[in-house]
């Protein structure tokens, strides 16, 4: 099974700021997510502490010794939503800064699904 992946404008903006080789490294991580879905485990993916959403995850990509992170979640439609990404090199507060942004983006995504009537009877996590 191939898992459907969507992304936010915030993720796209970050993606467009990357050089081609960084994009290729991120793309390799995203392809693993597409293939394995929620069963993608450490070291490629892990949970995110400090998120309001219990299912918030991160793709863990290394590029040239730098930890590039993509925060994502599976929505009630079982699609992976790439929310936001960044380089956490030397930033001990990266999760404190980015997890709330990812939470807000996921909340916006869920609200869009609600407006479209796609959440009727679906569990929100």
Task: Describe the function of each predicted region.
Residues 1-67, 76-80, 87-125:
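Basic, Lys/Arg-enriched alpha-helical interface segments
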């Amino acid at each position: 099974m191939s898992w459907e992946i969507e992304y936010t404008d915030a993720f796209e903006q970050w993606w467009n700021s990357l050089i081609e080789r960084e994009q290729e490294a991120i793309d390799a991580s995203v392809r693993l997510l597409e293939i394995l879905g929620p069963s993608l485990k450490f070291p490629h993916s892990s949970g995110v502490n400090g998120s309001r959403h219990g299912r918030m995850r991160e793709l863990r990509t290394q590029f040239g010794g730098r930890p590039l992170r993509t925060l994502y979640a599976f929505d009630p439609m079982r699609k992976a939503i790439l929310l936001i990404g960044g380089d956490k090199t030397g930033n001990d507060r990266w999760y404190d800064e980015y997890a709330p942004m990812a939470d807000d983006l996921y909340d916006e995504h869920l609200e869009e699904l609600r407006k479209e009537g796609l959440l009727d009877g679906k569990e929100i996590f």
